[in-house]
A protein has these predicted regions:
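Thiamine diphosphate
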Residues: 79-95
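Short glycine-/polar-rich loops that comprise or flank the Walker A/P-loop
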Residues: 65, 97-98
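Short, conserved "active-site rim" segments that organize catalytic pockets and cofactor/ligand binding
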Residues: 2-82
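Active-site microenvironments of hydrolase-like enzyme catalytic domains
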Residues: 100-109
């Protein structure tokens, strides 16, 4: 990991601790996902709230969910040229996701 003097040291150390703390099974899974790519069957369009960890809310592991975070979990009408439509198209056409969840909540932000 590249070190930047302005970047909070606790996050650099936290990442190092996370990598060192991976079990053999977890490490093998991440290596597999890195080599073979992801194959999520579910896409979630959620808000950008940093308090919400979408895969954790469903007890899902790495590579299981394709997550798009967007302000207010909005999905614009068809025909608008935007990154959200591109992400949905990618999820459906490239990953063949079978389900799309649009998830919002009160008191966001």
């Amino acid at each position: 990991m590249t070190q930047n003097s302005d970047f909070p040291k606790n996050y650099i150390e936290g990442h190092q601790n996370w990598v060192e703390g991976l079990s053999e099974k977890e490490s093998s899974l991440y290596q597999h996902l890195g080599r073979e790519g992801q194959t999520p069957t579910i896409m979630v369009i959620a808000c950008c709230d940093s308090r919400k960890m979408v895969p954790d809310m469903f007890n899902a592991g790495p590579g299981e969910f394709f997550v798009l975070r967007n302000i207010a979990n909005l999905v614009p009408p068809q025909g608008h040229d935007n990154g959200i439509a591109a992400a949905v198209e990618f999820g459906v056409n490239a990953f063949k996701v079978q389900h799309i969840i649009v998830m919002g909540h009160a008191a966001c932000g």
